[in-house]
Amino acid sequence: MDGDDRRTPLLGGEGGSTRPPSLRRRDSARSLRSTFLSRLPDKVRGGGDPERPAADVDLTRAKGLSQGEKEYYEKQLATLKIFEEVEALCMPGEFESDAEVLELEDKEQKQSESAMKISNYANIILLVFKVYATIKTGSMAIAASTLDSLLDFLAGGILYFTHLTMKSVNIYKYPIGKLRVQPVGIIVFAAIMATLGFQVLIQAIEQLVENKAGEKMTPEQLIWLYSIMLSATVVKLALYIYCRSSGNSIVQAYAKDHYFDVVTNVVGLVAAVLGDKFFWWIDPVGAVLLAVYTIVNWSGTVYENAVTLVGQCAPSDMLQKLTYLAMKHDPRVRRVDTVRAYSFGALYFVEVDIELSEDMRLGEAHSIGESLQDKIEKLPEVERAFVHVDFESTHKPEHRVRSRLPSTEP
């Protein structure tokens, strides 16, 4: 391809056709990658090797790329990487057996529960020490950090209760399980933390308005302050490092809280010391900064988890993965009609419509649809999949979602 021709789709049709690109079933990720690299402009071609995975193409070696061009090529490479992952999943024996999956899930669950218990025990111990530090120093910033630890203890209990609730299974009362409890618990947790921020903000502003300096700390009080706050910071940092590697969303909430505590401890300590040594108002100003940070940080967490409960569409790369998986699933699939994926808690619900031959026997069609459903549900991002089998794709949508929505007419 000419180095200046930027209009030909790199993954599109032959001969610079302006028709929309059509992906053929016989096309493999390797052939698509080779075609992609062969059509790269000269200034980019040095960063690619047809025998290497798409993810290994180094665009940093390409010279003269604008930011927009770089983003475009990165998106194309990401698409090829998705196709390669799907083809790897479709290889015989690539999916783990049910026994292996259960063993892995059991191991991850034990690790998650261990992280939760350690975090809760640490929160209790740190709360006791911070209460003592607050009484000894009388610092507003330290008091804000202590209130944060109190809510850590309460909210940690909520998260752990949420985890235990998810473990109890009753297929008659909750046919699809209780995974939705997870984002609900995180929302409650985050809402409590944001409420703490408002309370601390009000108290700090009141102290600033009163314009009254507190008493200076004694050397003994400073020693207690340094010892407790620095110890708490080190413990919280270690817990953050321990929890952040978990794939469990509840443990991730713990990790975020531990990181938040590291920030509040450091800012609270600095504000308390500077307020004692220099200007008294530094202490309440530090508390105001912590309060604003708390409100913004945890309000964002509330929004992120609330969105997962209202059926937000999956990102385009997820839809591409599902479409490619459905297309590569079986040569008897004539067409992939519809692919939908939307959040329903922490994971996605997936709907796929495929077209088969009108003359195909019911048992054969059922086997194709069921095996595709099994493949999709083994993806780590998917909770449930629904595969609809049809013999044509010109019909109207089966579901009447809009009829349930409020009228937009005034």
From Swiss-Prot:
Region (Disordered): 1-58
Family: Belongs to the cation diffusion facilitator (CDF) transporter (TC 2.A.4) family. SLC30A subfamily.
Domain of life of the source: Eukaryota
Vacuolar compartment spans: 136-140, 206-221, 276-284
NCBIfam families in UniProt: CDF
Keyword Membrane: yes
Segments in the Cytoplasmic topological domain: 1-114, 162-184, 243-258, 304-410
Coiled coil: none
Membrane-traversing stretches: 115-135, 141-161, 185-205, 222-242, 259-275, 285-303
Membrane disposition: Multi-pass membrane protein
Protein localization: Vacuole membrane
UniProt keyword terms in alphabetical order: Ion transport, Membrane, Transmembrane, Transmembrane helix, Transport, Vacuole
Keyword check for Ion transport: yes
Cellular compartments per GO CC: membrane; vacuolar membrane
Xref: Pfam families: Cation_efflux, ZT_dimer
Name assigned to this protein: Metal tolerance protein 3
Entry's Gene Ontology molecular function annotations: manganese ion transmembrane transporter activity
Main location: membrane
Job of this protein: Involved in sequestration of excess metal in the cytoplasm into vacuoles to maintain metal homeostasis.
Basic and acidic residues bias (residue ranges): 40-58
